A protein has these predicted regions:
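Rossmann-like dinucleotide/flavin-binding elements
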Residues: 62-93, 135-147, 158-171, 179-228
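N-terminal glycine-rich dinucleotide-binding loop that anchors FAD/FMN and/or NAD(P) in oxidoreductases
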Residues: 18-24, 106-135, 165-180
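N-terminal Rossmann-like NAD(P) cofactor-binding module of classical short-chain dehydrogenase/reductase
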Residues: 155
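Flavin-dependent oxidoreductase catalytic cores
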Residues: 1-71, 75, 80-91, 99, ...
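Hydrophobic, well-ordered secondary-structure elements that form the walls
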Residues: 40, 127, 216
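Repeat-solenoid scaffold signature
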Residues: 1-13, 123-138, 144-145
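Glycine-rich phosphate-binding loop signature in dinucleotide/nucleotide-binding domains
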Residues: 148-152
Length: 228
């Protein structure tokens, strides 16, 4: 398994909860199509084992243990926390929202993306078994909070947002009229409503255009999906 090279052993040892399940995002296939090194959403060490000496699950113990803060509990923040904790550091994860998982949790609620919650599920299970990790929700972090905590290092993993500026892979100038009633992907995921027929212009060429189209259609909207 690309997502978990130790899948057979974990099944044999009845460690099902430790399996990093494939989420079916096909970024591995996309890597091959674009002739770039293999990538995997669940296994960031893939294709780097020999080049960088990265192991999928074993992290060398740090010579000096530190108190560390990870601001943000999305996929990147949880992965950073897990690697740092496995190295033996004391890790605090602070998430400003009421849920841990960030983008993977939000997008897993869209039609067809339920498996994407596995990105957070695997990491949260591992972190919750570790005595050197604290997880906090409803905890927005700013410079003053970092100073008060007196940690050795802070890792900022506060995420990104889908653009809503009319630009895309093939559009280097804004699409004319995009500002008239346009909604960002983030707004739609968070429940924003749009009256009347909806046109989705997909200049990402991956998954989100199709997913948002299906999501809005299931809500009863008249949807037209357009690609370059």
């Amino acid at each position: 398994s690309i997502a978990d090279p130790y899948l057979p052993n974990k099944i044999r040892e009845n460690r099902v909860e430790d399996i990093r399940e494939c989420i079916g995002c096909n970024i591995c296939v996309s890597s091959d199509a674009f002739s770039i090194p293999l990538n995997c959403t669940q296994n960031p060490t893939i294709s780097q084992e020999w080049k960088r000496g990265w192991h999928p699950e074993i992290v060398p113990s740090a010579a000096s243990k530190k108190d560390l803060l990870v601001a943000g509990a999305g996929p990147a923040g949880l992965e950073a926390a897990l690697v740092l904790a496995r190295a033996g550091h004391r890790v605090t994860v602070a998430e400003k929202s009421s849920e841990l998982g960030g983008r993977s949790l939000l997008e897993s609620r869209l039609f067809g993306l339920g498996a994407w919650s596995r990105v957070a599920d695997y990491r949260l299970y591992q972190l919750r078994q570790m005595a050197n990790v604290d997880l906090y929700t409803d905890s927005e972090i700013d410079a003053d909070a970092v100073s008060e905590m007196e940690v050795d290092h802070t890792f900022v993993a506060t995420g990104a947002h889908w653009l809503n500026n009319g630009l895309g892979r093939t559009h280097f100038d804004p699409i004319e009229g995009f500002e008239q009633g346009s909604l960002s992907v983030d707004a739609i995921i968070n429940g924003a409503k749009q009256d009347g027929p909806i046109v989705i212009y997909d200049d990402e060429h991956y998954y989100m255009g199709n997913v948002i189209a299906a999501h809005l259609a299931r809500l009863g909207n008249d949807v037209t999906l357009v690609t370059p």
